[in-house]
């Protein structure tokens, strides 16, 4: 059983993307910025420590992808939250490589993502 429950979610239209970003509690003003970037593969990770979410977001942004995080992530009021990782298959594989260079908790997330990405046909 996996800890972060990575799974693909169906995001085929901008409306789908807006709904999923809103559902995890992102700032409403950020939805229109992030939704167009979601038309690729979108992976939801559950119960991610918010300090890890910030690093995952920074790494994915450096690859040209996006990570939607809860509105108050950078204030660290909550300990964990759900996040949406959005990118092309190539960007997602590159993210796995980047996360695998970090500390053990992020390496574990990288391993779970790698398993999920191997399921893409």
Report residues per predicted region.
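Flexible, glycine/charged-enriched surface loops at secondary-structure junctions
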Residues: 69-72
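N-terminal amphipathic alpha-helix/helix-capping segment at the start of soluble metabolic enzymes
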Residues: 2-36, 80, 110-121
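Non-catalytic propeptide/linker segments at domain boundaries
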Residues: 90-121
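A generic structural motif
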Residues: 75-90
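Conserved, mostly hydrophobic/aromatic
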Residues: 60
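Phosphorylation-prone, low-complexity intrinsically disordered regions
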Residues: 51-52
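A short, structured beta-strand/loop element
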Residues: 64-66
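Short glycine-/aliphatic-rich beta-strand segments at the starts of folded cytosolic domains
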Residues: 33-48
């Amino acid at each position: 059983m996996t800890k972060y429950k990575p799974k693909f979610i169906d995001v085929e239209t901008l409306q789908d993307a807006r709904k999923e970003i809103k559902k995890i509690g992102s700032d409403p003003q950020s939805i229109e910025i992030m939704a167009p970037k979601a038309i690729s593969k979108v992976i939801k990770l559950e119960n991610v420590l918010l300090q890890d979410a910030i690093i995952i977001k920074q790494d994915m942004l450096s690859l040209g992808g996006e990570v939607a995080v809860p509105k108050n992530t950078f204030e660290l009021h909550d300990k964990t939250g759900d996040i949406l990782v959005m990118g092309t298959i190539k960007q997602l594989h590159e993210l796995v490589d980047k996360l695998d260079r970090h500390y053990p908790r992020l390496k574990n997330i990288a391993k779970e993502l790698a398993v999920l990405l191997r399921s893409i046909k």
